[in-house]
Amino acid sequence: MEYLYTERAHLMCPGMSFGITAEVSAPFDEKRIKDSFAVLAQAHPFLKALLGHDRRSNAYYYDITEISKTELIIKKKMLADLEDAEILREFERLTGYEWNLFNEGMLKASAWKIGETGERTGFLLVFHHLLTDGRGALGLAQELAEYYARGKKPEYAPERLISAENTFPDKNRMPLISRMLVNTANSDWKREKHDPPDYSRYRDFAGEYIKSNKPFHALSRRSREEVKAMTFSCRENGITVNDLLIAQMMTEEGADKIIIASDLRSRLPGYNSGSLGNYSTAFSIEIKKKHKDIYELAKAIHKKVQKTLNDPAALYLILNCYESLEPPLLDASFISVRGCYNSKAAKFIGTMFFGFASPSGHSITNLGKTESVSMTKAYFIPPASPAIKKTLGILTVNGEMTICTSERLHIQMGATGDKERGFHIDSPKQKY
């Protein structure tokens, strides 16, 4: 049985669902679609899981059942291509409320006919963050495409999560100040003697929060030629494409700090290859010095990124915080900041560590590049964390890069946005 450990940070935090869209080079076949998701569930136990709770220990776990818990929706409407606005509208519908994970699975999927005759099939996979991270989601989408188009079955990959016994590499100890703050918050929490936050009460509050804080999504594209030019210029300057994208975001948003997601699979000895679960961290890069040249800014970013990647204490900082905080204190951090729970200790952590008081941060998650005959197109819809103002989700498939923006809008309770969700081709402002 797998228990929530560092994943606990995603349990009582709204807006943490995200999506992968995929266009598969095989005709629409409803029976084949249903069979494909059944096959995925046989390979990945978490697709058959609900949320479980041990009241005595207040531990949450993945309660694996006998059947798939994926909610599959077969759409009748035919779409011209994967960039149809209908897909983003469907994502916003499926993420427009807080899922009840005691009764609902952690994956919801929709499927459409793509093309004039349905000669291709389009999928939207919507993941709760407790199921997996972006890299795991992309892997599942690739397995779906390979089985649906070519009949290639995924290998059985039971999940083996980060745990107290299966923890991080050496030299990842938190800095002294962070340890002191965490220890103080834990002590204050114990002195407050609160009952643990109730999941159902959290869901009621989170549902209202989501209604009044709907994110807006938009897409932009970089053609194969543009991606090639970008890659060449980055190599010439000794930086990565991601360094350049971060520099562009800093420049366009006027931001000094960007939060970056980083995959840890190759660093975790306990990771079971191909399995679902969360095996990523996040860290921030701050550049206060102004740079007129975007490549000089990207070079400064590159140095800071590489320094963090080579410093376990910095790389694992946020995961160490999740691991070290009292679990109910972690549960209460968001709702305490938002006034639904009265804990000074949790409010302090939610404000100072996680930034829940106001969504002012910027972040970027790049799932890299992949080549696939079966999955001809895809893009990544990043989560809209309540701590983040704007997030970029980046995925390059068969040489074409798609950037999806999740930007949180502050609107009145019960109102709905009237902006058209959909695909637009955004010409790059930077010439390469």
Regions found by a protein language model. Give the residues of each.
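Acyl-thioester-dependent acyl-group transfer interface
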Residues: 1-59, 82-107, 254-432
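Acyl-thioester-dependent condensation/acyltransferase catalytic cores
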Residues: 41-135, 139-142, 146-150
